[in-house]
């Protein structure tokens, strides 16, 4: 028996069953291990832009191995986006918020395990902190690097730049 399988006839069992059956979850799937896919995807940063596609692959893999997947979205701190406003004061609190969000969703829904799609230097520690606090079977998938951009100005035509190149050039410009 999985921790997510509530006692038949209990209030929690009835409410969950009503909610999930209305979402199209079949009766025979109700007894499977319920696995969260923690997805930090958003369209604010290139760190996360590819995670929705990976999430679909992970969902199918969970189904193929006898589990019931649930995508769970969280806030996604990114140094380059979150630090843009108010002198970066949201960066570390956002990481901690993410830990709390994961814990609330996992414990609130009483899910059996989680697979975390991690793709930034703040999401990885947050996922590891969540796994340690929750003490449920957890897998952290590091999902790749930031894609670079292509410059299309005069002498830089067809050159690719990553974020480090941008910082170096801004620094060079600032120092003359």
Task: Identify what each model region corresponds to.
Residues 1-32, 56:
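N-terminal amphipathic/basic leader segments beginning at the initiator methionine
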Residues 15-21, 68-116:
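Glycine-rich oxoanion-binding loops at beta->alpha junctions
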Residues 27-31, 36, 42-73:
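Glycine-rich phosphate/diphosphate-binding loop of Rossmann-like nucleotide-binding domains
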């Amino acid at each position: 028996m999985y921790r997510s399988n509530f006692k038949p006839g209990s209030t929690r069992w009835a409410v969950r069953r009503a909610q999930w059956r209305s979402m199209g979850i079949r009766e025979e799937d109700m007894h499977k291990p319920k696995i969260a896919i923690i997805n930090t995807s958003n369209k604010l940063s290139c760190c996360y832009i590819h995670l929705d596609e990976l999430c679909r692959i992970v969902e199918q893999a969970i189904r193929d191995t006898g589990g019931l997947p649930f995508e769970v979205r969280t806030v996604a701190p990114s140094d380059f986006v979150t630090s843009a406003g108010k002198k970066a004061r949201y960066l570390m609190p956002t990481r901690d918020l993410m830990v709390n969000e994961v814990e609330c969703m996992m414990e609130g829904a009483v899910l059996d395990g989680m697979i975390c799609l991690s793709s930034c230097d703040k999401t990885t520690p947050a996922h590891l902190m969540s796994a340690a606090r929750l003490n449920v079977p957890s897998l952290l998938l590091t999902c790749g690097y930031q894609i670079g951009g292509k410059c299309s100005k005069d002498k830089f035509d067809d050159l690719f730049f990553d974020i480090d190149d941008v910082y170096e050039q801004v620094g060079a410009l600032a120092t003359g």
